[in-house]
A protein has these predicted regions:
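Glycine-rich segments within core transmembrane alpha-helices of 12-TM secondary carriers
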Residues: 134-163, 204, 389-400
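Extracellular/periplasmic helix-loop-helix junction of adjacent transmembrane segments
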Residues: 29-61
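Cytoplasmic helix-loop-helix junction between adjacent transmembrane helices
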Residues: 105-142
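Cytosolic juxtamembrane N-terminal segment immediately preceding the first transmembrane helix
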Residues: 1-26, 37
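Helix-breaking motifs and short loop linkers at transmembrane-helix boundaries and internal kinks
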Residues: 74, 95-100, 341-344
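Helix-to-loop junctions at the C-terminal end of transmembrane segments
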Residues: 63-74, 308-320
Length: 456
């Protein structure tokens, strides 16, 4: 098998991690009002679900653990066991009958997602050819779009009649049949739609586990490991977190992490809220039914996938600085338009959804995944990503808790929340456009030598 085909095959297998990451977030989002009705949850409860989920703190905890584990024991070690933890978390959500069970399921799933992210982005970059790193990261981001699309379509088909809708989705009868086996009705019956959606993630996680545990170890990690073993024992001894100090004692590392966190953090503050609360916002502030909110969001993900595909074709061939600037500008314009036209306006919702989809297709996350895997040496490449992901998702958890109180029970604070998110989006536009590195066409070893010298 050629190197190009091999890297593409491994990219597709590892990309299932992105599918399950975004899928877990959107599965929670698409059924949020159903769980709220079933368990009698307040906006504060919803804020906690977001805060500890794959969207925020759960992933943050998993990332800092997974990053160091991937550097010490290898990328393959993560793929051998992590999906089993994901399946456990999803299973807990599927059988939840109270808020603590649901919260625990979201937390376990989130931790698993976080553990897998640094290893997956690092593995993809290390197994890509020089001219295909951006393409392969783009393909992995397509999985990040395909997951929500499938989940939202499934959620739409299974949606119960809510809001002004006279009937449920085309497959709501399946939920009624399954719910009937357990003798449930009302809100308890409606939430079976969400349980089935999470079951679909369980199935995909099982497939991912079988594919990923058969992957070969990263050749670059093995080379870095072999080089480290040649060093005196006292230079390499230490715990799993032995490289933690090295990250913060090198000026190049510090400036790189400040740059990457600066561009990714405020973007993620906005996108974490939209990833988890978008259908809920469309229902409460926008006045749509659960079915139509999910359908509009699903249409958005179709545009995201198409835009990401175009991104994957051109990112290795154009100046990445300007491609980045165009993508983030779409997001800034989206918030300007929704503030001007209003969330209650159908035209405002449609324009916002389209522009939001375009920015997500050429997303800050795509560039973050690419640059974060290029700008650090192999020996702590995943650990550096784990630290940054921990910071970003951890602070996103705090913002998610604040957002629900700003937004209000029925969206009365939407204008203020949207104004804040517009301000958040301007920050990565400036930081990323000004500080974009020039790495296109260079090997990872060449980039490392240029930035760190021969000692690394």
């Amino acid at each position: 098998m050629s190197a190009t085909k091999s890297s593409l095959k491994s990219t597709l297998a590892v990309s299932l991690t992105n599918y399950l990451d975004a899928g877990a977030i959107v599965a929670g989002a698409s059924g949020l009002t159903l769980w709220q009705s079933y368990l009698g949850l307040s906006e504060g409860h919803l804020g906690w679900l977001n805060a500890i989920s794959a969207n925020c703190l759960g992933a943050a905890i998993g990332a800092i653990i997974g990053g160091f584990l991937a550097d010490k024991y290898g990328r393959k070690a993560i793929y051998t066991y992590n999906m089993l933890v994901y399946m456990l978390g999803v299973a807990l959500i599927m059988v939840s009958v109270n808020f603590p069970m649901l919260l625990l399921g979201f937390l376990v799933t989130g931790i698993s997602v976080g553990v897998g992210v640094p290893a997956s982005w690092t593995y993809i970059s290390e197994n890509s050819e020089v001219g295909n790193r951006g393409r392969n990261i783009g393909i992995s981001q397509m999985a990040w779009g395909i997951g929500p699309l499938i989940i939202l379509l499934l959620g739409t088909l299974l949606a119960p009649p809510t809001g002004e809708a006279a009937s449920g989705g085309l497959l709501f009868g399946l939920s009624e049949v399954v719910g009937g086996w357990f003798g449930v009705e009302g809100a308890a019956l409606n939430v079976f739609s969400s349980r089935i959606v999470f079951f679909s993630l369980f199935v995909v996680a099982f497939i991912a586990w079988n594919l990923q545990r058969r992957l070969d170890e990263s050749a670059e990690w093995k080379a870095a490991k072999a080089e480290a073993e040649k060093q005196p024992k006292q230079a390499t001894a230490g715990s799993v977190f032995a490289s933690f100090g090295k990250l913060f004692t090198n000026k190049t590392n510090i400036f790189t992490m400040l740059f990457l966190c600066g561009m990714y953090l405020t973007w993620n503050l906005v996108c974490s809220v939209m990833g988890f609360f978008q259908p809920h916002i469309y229902e409460t502030a926008g006045g749509l039914s659960n079915e139509y909110a999910n359908l509009l969001a699903a249409g958005q993900w179709l545009v995201i996938i198409a835009t990401t595909f175009v991104f994957s074709l051109i990112v290795d061939k154009v100046k990445q600085r300007w491609l980045y600037a165009v993508g983030v500008s779409f997001g800034v314009l989206a918030w300007v338009i929704v503030l001007f036209l209003g969330i209650n306006s159908l035209s405002g919702l449609l324009f916002f959804t389209l522009l939001w989809a375009l920015q997500a297709g050429i997303s800050v996350q795509s560039f973050y995944a690419l640059w974060a895997s290029e700008l650090f040496p192999a020996k702590y490449r995943a650990a550096a990503q784990g630290v940054m992901f921990f910071i970003v998702r951890g602070l996103s958890a705090v913002w998610g808790l604040a957002f629900v109180y700003i937004y209000g029970e029925n969206g009365q604070g939407f204008t203020l929340a949207a104004s804040i998110m517009l301000a958040f989006f301007v920050i990565p536009l400036l930081i990323g456009t000004i500080g974009a590195p020039v790495t296109r066409g260079k090997t990872l070893e060449q980039i490392t030598r240029e930035r760190y010298g021969d000692d690394f």
